[in-house]
Amino acid sequence: MAPANDAFVAEAAGEVVGSYFLHANQLGGGSHVANCGYVTAQQATGRGIARAMCRHSIDHARARGFRAMQYNIVVSTNERAIRLWQAMGFAIVGRLPGAFAHPALGDVDAFVMYQTL
């Protein structure tokens, strides 16, 4: 599988409401696992944008030949995202104690989430 970094933009009514990247989580022996990062515009929260981007990223990862997808750092206090990723088939496979410096809460845990494609 050739290494590549893909980026996508979600639009609604001509307005950018989100974006995500997709690439191999690692080179070499781990290159069959995809990694994504998503951003949803604050004004678009609750409109299904993140769910649509996740669904698109899973389909795109499969089309590129990835066999799994991993999120390396999901902030433990982002309960909405955790529920969504779990609903989309991801499982929490690890906890990183104090791995995220939250601007309001200080150091909080982060999760590694994973699913086989």
Task: Show which residues each predicted segment covers.
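Acetyl-CoA-dependent GNAT
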Residues: 1-43, 54-55, 116-117
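Conserved acetyl-CoA-binding loop of GNAT-fold acetyltransferases
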Residues: 86-96
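Conserved beta-strand-loop-alpha-helix junction that forms the acyl-donor binding cleft
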Residues: 71-81, 99-103
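Conserved acetyl-CoA-binding loop-helix of GNAT-fold acetyltransferases
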Residues: 38-40, 46-63, 79-87
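Terminal substrate-recognition subdomain of acyl/acetyltransferases
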Residues: 96, 102-117
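Conserved GNAT acetyl-CoA-binding A-motif
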Residues: 61-74
